Amino acid sequence: FGLTTATVYLSRFPGDKVGDDNAIPVSVVLLPDFSGMTQQQRLNPPAVELSATELTIPPIEEKAKKKLTVIVTNVGKSDLEITDLQVFNPALGVQLKKRVLKPGAKTKMKITAYGKYLNKVKGTPRVLMITNDPNCPKVIIKVNVTAK
């Protein structure tokens, strides 16, 4: 499960050089298959809830880093498993205390933005979380941040 990325390079003429100006990044997110769930599992699913799905950080210096915390809660009726946790680019780092949450349990997800990589980011930095919640298997947290 999770994020798979590749870069496709386009050319108009034979012999065109490969570079950032003719590169197209392609991303695919593979999600878990819930078709084999039993009736009991369907009636008592885990449910993920986040304290925030979009974070805003003021512009940071190139040599600086900024940490934020998101609280992940299981509001469902069975164990929530966080099977994959990935960032879309190197400008972010992510840490998670626990990957399995009992019903009602919480854990902290620490997201770090690194200033030295922000100038190379195209688009909005994001964190991808894959869970066994059949109603929300893919959670994306957007981090609005720029370099100073």
What is the meaning of each model-derived region?
Residues 1-10, 21-23, 62-69, 116-128:
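Short, solvent-exposed loop/turn segments enriched in Ser/Thr/Gly
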Residues 77-106:
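Surface-exposed binding patches on compact interaction domains or structured appendages
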Residues 63, 105-108:
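Alpha-helical transmembrane segments and membrane-interface helix-loop junctions
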Residues 15, 58, 96-101, 114:
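Beta-strand-rich interaction surfaces with strong enrichment in secreted/lumenal proteins
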Residues 109-117:
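Short, hydrophobic beta-strand segments
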Residues 11-71, 75-76, 133-148:
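Long, low-complexity ectodomains and other extracytoplasmic segments of secretory-pathway proteins
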